[in-house]
Amino acid sequence: QRFFNEYLKETVKTMIYFLTSSPSVSVDGPINPANGFLDRLREALGNNPLHALFVTTYPDDAPWSEHCSDCMRKAFEDVGFKFASYVLLDRRTAPDVKKLMKQCDLLILGGAHLPTQNTFLHELEMPKLIKKFKGVVLGISAGTMNSARMAYALPEEPGEPHDKNFARLRPGLGLTEWRILPHFYMYKELTVDGLRMYDDITIPDSRKYGIPFLYFPDGTYLVGQDGKESVYGEYLVFQDGTFCRVAENGQKTLLD
């Protein structure tokens, strides 16, 4: 019986997801090791060469997608990760998504415009495919936001805040119930159409829809597996009309 239990531990895998504001110290920069991110990612991925799949946000913009994908691959290789394969999932490779997902160890959900990526994810039937995925998911910015069961689309492009047809809640991938807003220190200073990102858009939306938001600075991330989720690093939450800082860098917070 003991042998059988040990065998199960080695063979039964479940998905692990890392939802980041950004895994890098700067745009197109090296991996950020803050809050033990690199160590935990190494532990989750193991030592074997990886089969990675990078999901772009703009499937029809090949140059932009290739640049983002290549920068992410280089950042991983620079800290010692090796790849057996590394595939950019865009319009050209979309027909092979089921086969690619079956061989994938590391699924990277890129950043940028959430609604555009959300549309592509549903075209790929990714919410269905990801339910059977047993590898590691890495969410980056918009990719992290789209990982929620019901994703919140922050109006960040001119015209979106006042567009009555702009859907702020959209079905996501269903990895988590939490809605994470990335790049806290950058976004809190930004405005769009004369509105402050946080004070005039996200906080009123939290009240309107009755949903809490987790605000992550770069370097903070959420790890989830088997229904348990923890945040590593500094983050803030707006819930029930209250905006508060929950944790600082270096701290781990278990989410309820």
Regions from the PLM with identified roles:
Residues Q1-T14:
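Short, Lys/Arg-enriched N-terminal segments with co-localized hydrophobic residues
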Residues M15-N47, P59, E66, D70, ...:
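C-terminal and late-domain segments of enzyme folds
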